[in-house]
């Protein structure tokens, strides 16, 4: 989720644009078709996911049973849905960089001393985030020789043990945070990526209840401690904390236990589940400030996906988005009784191909449109155009029709949309907008549009170098190689 603002509903203004550009309909359509055809690797490719694992090598290393469970999960992985739900940062809604997120945990059976294996998704560091690519790999521990340290709890200890394969080893070494995050994890939220379980989103998100519905009432008044202006899923915290304690092997059988919930780097709360006196009802939830010190850091962390009301549910309740603009699997889960409709097409883009545009030119309305794949004036003969182009070179003042074409090349009205598509990795969508405006045969002139496309290409090279391990650990705090110098967004919470 994106960073929340104390001003209340400010975040609702940019989530619709995130939903418009981050996972385009063409990606969803292609990835879904390949997944339904049984081509999980092809679905990943369509969704911008780089696969860094080999199920055959998993069978040799960890046994056929674990490999079979992995293959079943890969067949039902909806990578476009995973991209839809991954944590994002404000203000642009880009993927939160430098994360390793556990999607599934496989406990080894019949192998004494074997450590759990995690299917993980990784996002690259911010300086190498061109294309908003995601990598999919396996993780079975930490290697002390590379200086990696384990996390507390179920995600490892300070012991040293090996990686699955050389490629995963290299990927972990070049990643800033190679071990699975305790806060950003989806192994307890399989409905956010597993096509078999997407219907669970309705219950887990609270969409089956009105806002502030009939969940267990926290006591005492938690809202005095919960940061104001943030859509915390307080009515789900008790149930989510029970799931967390059970998954991490800390369940007491009575529902009692303690977990932490994080709000950014400096704010934490303790969620204490207090068993009912007679043991016959759900545990009560007591919320207190987390004490400073090591005690709280060793407690289980409520997953980020459990902490907040999902943005799609907020948008629907606020009337800020149409249900047909949501991912189809999300829409069917949140609004199961909606009439069957075809998936929403891509958003309408300005200056559609084939439609002439009107320009006020010397007291008359003239047209400019695509002719033989190039944006051209329609109401001036070739001799007049040659004469006007020569005069423009001498005087620097072209006639309005030529000036409109030049402006379309250098700084078109659609530049913001092109930039957002490039930022989110939708190269094909960005080029479609440009070609719809200027034509497929156009030669770009110097200006902001050409600069954006060139920077996008440079940043893709930077990502390739990062993937290949040829660029070291990356730059310092300043803009990375190929960066267009935009300030990094604030991270979530």
Language-model features, listed with the residues they occupy:
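C-terminal structured domains
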Residues: 264-493
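Short acidic-hydrophobic surface loop/beta-edge motif
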Residues: 101-103, 261, 357-359
């Amino acid at each position: 989720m994106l960073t929340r603002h104390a001003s209340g509903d400010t975040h609702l203004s940019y989530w619709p644009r995130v939903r418009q550009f981050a996972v385009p309909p063409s990606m969803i359509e292609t990835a879904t078709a390949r997944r339904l055809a049984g081509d999980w690797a092809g679905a990943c490719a369509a969704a911008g996911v780089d696969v860094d694992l080999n199920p055959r090598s998993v069978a040799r290393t960890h046994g056929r049973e674990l490999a079979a469970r992995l293959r079943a999960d890969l067949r039902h992985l909806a990578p476009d849905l995973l991209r839809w739900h991954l944590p994002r940062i404000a203000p642009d809604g880009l993927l939160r960089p430098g994360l390793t997120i556990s999607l599934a945990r496989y406990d080894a059976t019949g192998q004494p001393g074997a450590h759990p294996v995690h299917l993980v998704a990784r996002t690259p560091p911010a300086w190498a985030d061109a294309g908003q690519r995601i990598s999919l790999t396996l993780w079975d521990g930490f290697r002390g020789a590379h200086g990696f340290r384990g996390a507390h709890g179920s995600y490892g200890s300070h012991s040293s043990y090996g990686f699955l394969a050389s490629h995963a080893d290299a990927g972990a070494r070049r990643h800033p945070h190679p071990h699975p995050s305790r806060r950003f994890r989806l192994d307890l939220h399989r409905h956010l990526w597993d096509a078999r379980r997407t219907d669970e989103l309705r219950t887990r998100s609270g969409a089956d209840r009105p806002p502030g519905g009939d969940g267990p009432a926290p006591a005492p008044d938690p809202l005095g401690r919960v940061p104001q202006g943030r859509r915390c899923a307080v009515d789900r915290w008790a149930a989510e904390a029970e799931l967390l304690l059970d998954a991490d092997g800390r369940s007491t059988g009575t529902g009692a236990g303690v977990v932490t919930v994080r709000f950014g780097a400096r704010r934490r709360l303790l969620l204490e589940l207090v068993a009912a006196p007679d043991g016959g009802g759900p545990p009560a939830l007591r919320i207190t400030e987390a004490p400073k010190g090591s005690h709280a850091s060793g407690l289980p962390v409520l997953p980020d996906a459990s902490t907040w009301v999902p943005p799609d549910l907020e948008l629907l309740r606020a009337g800020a988005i149409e249900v047909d603009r949501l991912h189809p699997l999300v829409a069917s889960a949140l609004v199961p009784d909606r009439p069957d409709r075809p998936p929403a097409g891509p958003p309408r883009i300005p200056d559609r191909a084939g439609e002439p545009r009107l320009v006020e030119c010397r007291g008359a309305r003239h047209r400019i449109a695509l002719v033989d794949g190039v944006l051209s004036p329609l109401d001036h003969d070739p001799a007049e155009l040659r004469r006007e182009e020569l005069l423009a070179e001498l005087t620097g003042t072209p006639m309005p029709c030529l000036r409109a074409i030049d402006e379309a090349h250098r700084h078109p009205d659609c530049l913001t949309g092109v930039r957002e598509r490039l930022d989110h990795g939708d190269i094909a969508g960005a080029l479609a907008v440009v070609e719809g405006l200027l034509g497929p045969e156009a030669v770009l002139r110097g200006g902001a549009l050409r600069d954006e496309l060139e920077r996008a290409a440079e940043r893709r090279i930077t990502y390739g170098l990062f993937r290949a391990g040829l660029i070291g650990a990356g730059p310092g705090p300043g803009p990375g190689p190929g960066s267009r110098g935009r300030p990094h967004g604030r991270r979530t919470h």
